[in-house]
Amino acid sequence: MKIVRVTPLPLSCRSANGPMTFFVVRIETDDGLVGYGESCDCFGVSFPAVHAAVVRDAFAPLLVGRELIAVAPLVDELRVSTRRQLGQSWASAQARSAIEIALWDLVGQDAGRSVSAILGRVRDTIPVYAGSSPFLDDHDAAFHLDRLTPMLERGVRHVKLRTGPDSDRAVDVLADLRRLLGRDVEIMVDASESLDLPTTARISDRMAELDVRWLEEPLLQSRHSAVAAAAARSRVPIAAGEHLFSTEEALAALVAGEISVIQPDPCISGGIAEAREIAGLAAGFGARAVLHYHAGLVGLGAVLQVAACAPGVDLLEYPVHLDTVLRTQSGGDELGISAIVDGRLALPDRPGIGVAPLASVLSESLIS
């Protein structure tokens, strides 16, 4: 099948927290198939027009007219052909991830099989954790419990909260929340690269007493020696992955001892195959593999395909506020919070990535 059209789609959709922006790519073939992919920069896509420009100006001309026989050669050509001009990380890698996902969607549809079936499906459901975006230090424990309740009621027993500018206050609130949740719910904390080494050491000691299962991105991921020092000192496992843009970068972080929980995301790290490969590195370093997700419907479809074919993955992020986005883009509740049963989400096994956004919603959400 031949690629005939590559269309970048910068989108704006309303989440439970308010408007968010996203980036989706649509790829069409000469036999009428349509594949979708999505990128992410950790929280939707803050500058979707940038990703659109990368796809429109750099990637699309390399793809239109090409035969889609296998995904990897085309994606590698995008990387090699543009790396000296665009680099191999950040917006370039994120936009390339969207392309890779869309190509896999097409390959799966053409074969009449899910991507995970092609790559080796190992499970049909995955446990999820509730990701809550408001800062711990901005509200009391009762507020945070209320935010988490819809997912706790669906049997979810893993939750992640975020620290804000007042990290000590955040841990105080976390202690109150731990008392409300009891010890049957696992708690994780995301610092969003906001701390320094002394603060990381201090609050990780306090978090260890609260049985926090990981502290995510306490420092800028680019400060490798500092991250490694924090990991060596912390009594709580250090997690990261949403700023790792390739298997090579993930391997370097694991070798350096920077992380013990790795969090690949196919919308960031190069696509479905790359995220699966990154997840596969974890066991060799005694690390845990947990999938990051913070995009829209197409992104979740890609993440779920990785979850279905990556044997070492044991947990998947599910941001509470994205339920609204998922229901809007799909026109149903199949992947909304109400679809979570006993804390687990079913993994689609339809051809391709198993999901497709409503064309009408894409048109209405398109940023001109």
Q: Where in this protein do the model-derived segments appear?
A:
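Short, glycine/acidic-enriched loop or turn micro-motifs at the edges of active sites
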Residues: D41, T163, S192-L195, L219-L220, ...
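Extended hydrophobic packing segments that form well-structured cores
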Residues: P351-S368
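Conserved, mostly hydrophobic/aromatic
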Residues: G32, F59, I99, G112, ...
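Metal- or metallocofactor-binding catalytic centers and their adjacent structured scaffolds
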Residues: E28-D110
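Shared catalytic-loop signature of beta/alpha-barrel
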Residues: V54-D57, G87, D205, D211, ...
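Structured beta-strand/loop patches that form or line metal/cofactor-binding pockets in enzymes
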Residues: M1-G44, V325-R327
